[in-house]
Amino acid sequence: MAKEGFLVGEALVGEEPEIAHIDLIIGRKEGPVGQAFANSLSQPRVGHTAILAVVRPNLPVKPATLIVPKVTIKDLEGAELIFGPAQSAVAKAVADAVDEGVIPRAMVEDLVVIVSVFIHPRGKDYQRVYRYNYAATKLAVKRAMEGFPGIDVVLEEKPKAAHEMIGFRINNLELPPYLGVELVFDDWRRVEGILRSLPRKDG
């Protein structure tokens, strides 16, 4: 890893409302990620307070990992999901990544990790929150360290774009299912009349 560079990872795991969406960056303490880590920890934001990932109370994981909630925490129930199962899951995933050699053990004191965690406001099941966030964090770390996805994968997959949280499948805009019409008239009023008669939406 370059001294001033950082790695990016993302993963979506599970089902609503406990679905886990993890975005993370991994970088050196003396680089931009280290600076962002220190700023986030020293300048808390209301509803998005960053917390250290701990394997258990009084035992922060290595490399030092910061958890930043994506959704504004508005009540004690939301706070408990972050400070409980999500915090433990992220820490366990990072520790396992080191144990399995995904993150080099020799670099744990040089690196920091910032993990942006999505907790659905309707999430209730602590076990699901833990399992999904563990799996998503571990996958995101692996993807970051491996540089996934490469640009070839992105370009190959972009026509098949779909996202389960959108609720619909995106059409291939390179081959739009639209009717192409060429109008050649001298009288603009005739063109306007034809355009007004066209349906405003599909189906």
Region spans (language model):
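Accessory interaction regions appended to the cores of large information-processing enzymes
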Residues: 1-203
